[in-house]
């Protein structure tokens, strides 16, 4: 997790930190085909998000992710922070939506739909292939290999999570500390690892048991598929959700056994939380910023 953020998290950091809200007059003119309002220098001093906006975006995202985690919902840090940054951008510009990078936001939103579907399809195919191979192999020998493979794939999931979620968590801070990206990545990775160890068990139970039962080969297929999908999007600088990818992959494994083996109600409730999270985070961040700054 820490290594993923430190070595390959910069693309997502740049997108979250500087690619969602337009704070530069030149970028505004190029994006909107018109000169920016004269108040842009008041909205975004020094051509960046104000410090209050950065803090409120982070607090808003952290609040919604914490509440969801406590409620056992695997929501997306990516969605929460993107919503938070967009919200403070709208609040800082006095509700002028032209300061949002609409094209970037649409691309991000599209990736939130594609990512779990891609992971689901990959997991479905990989689990089906593993099933064929296991039927032709000695059970005892393959059991040991699968156990080791699950541990390795779990490490890959953590690495991929770091490449994306660390960038999400600290992306807004590069507005304030553009020369401290390695240190911020290390801090973000350590903080996420600490949160996973101390507060992640509730969500782990939901994903691992309440969607569909997983054996070793199912866990391997789900982990590899989710990690691969997230890693690709991270390299492209698109903030997607590891949670969404993992849930999609677990559903893919379940579908190989038939639709009845997937907890439909739980999947629907999780999907609803994915819609609520960015909207709520954006609304809260926007309102909080206007309240704080008047």
Where does each model-flagged region fall?
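Multi-pass alpha-helical transmembrane bundle typical of ion/small-solute transporters
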Residues: 1-294
């Amino acid at each position: 997790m820490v290594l993923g953020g430190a070595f390959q998290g910069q693309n997502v950091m740049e997108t979250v930190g500087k690619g969602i809200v337009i704070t530069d007059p030149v970028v505004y003119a190029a994006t909107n085909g018109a000169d920016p309002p004269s108040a842009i220098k008041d909205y975004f001093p020094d051509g960046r998000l104000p410090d209050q906006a950065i803090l409120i975006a982070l607090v808003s995202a952290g609040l919604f992710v914490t509440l969801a985690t406590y409620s056992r919902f695997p929501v997306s840090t990516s969605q929460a922070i993107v919503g938070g940054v967009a919200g403070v951008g709208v609040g800082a510009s006095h509700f002028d939506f032209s300061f949002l990078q609409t094209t970037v936001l649409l691309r991000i939103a599209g990736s939130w739909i594609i990512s779990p579907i891609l992971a689901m399809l990959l997991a479905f195919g990989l689990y089906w292939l593993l099933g064929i191979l296991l039927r032709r192999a000695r059970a005892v020998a393959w059991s040991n290999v699968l156990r080791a493979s699950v541990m390795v794939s779990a490490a890959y999931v953590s690495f991929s999570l770091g490449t994306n979620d660390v960038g999400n968590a600290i992306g807004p801070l590069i507005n304030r500390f553009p020369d401290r990206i390695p240190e911020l990545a290390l801090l973000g990775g350590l903080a996420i690892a600490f949160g996973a160890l101390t507060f992640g068990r509730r969500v782990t139970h939901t994903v691992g048991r309440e969607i569909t039962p997983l054996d070793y080969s199912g866990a391997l297929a789900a982990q590899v598929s989710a990690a691969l999908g997230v890693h690709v999007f991270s390299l492209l600088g698109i903030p997607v959700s590891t949670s969404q990818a993992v849930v999609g992959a677990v559903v893919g494994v379940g579908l190989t056994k038939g639709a009845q083996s997937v907890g439909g109600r739980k999947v629907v409730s999780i999907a609803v939380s994915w819609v609520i999270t960015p909207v709520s985070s954006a609304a809260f961040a926007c309102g909080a910023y206007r309240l704080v700054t008047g």
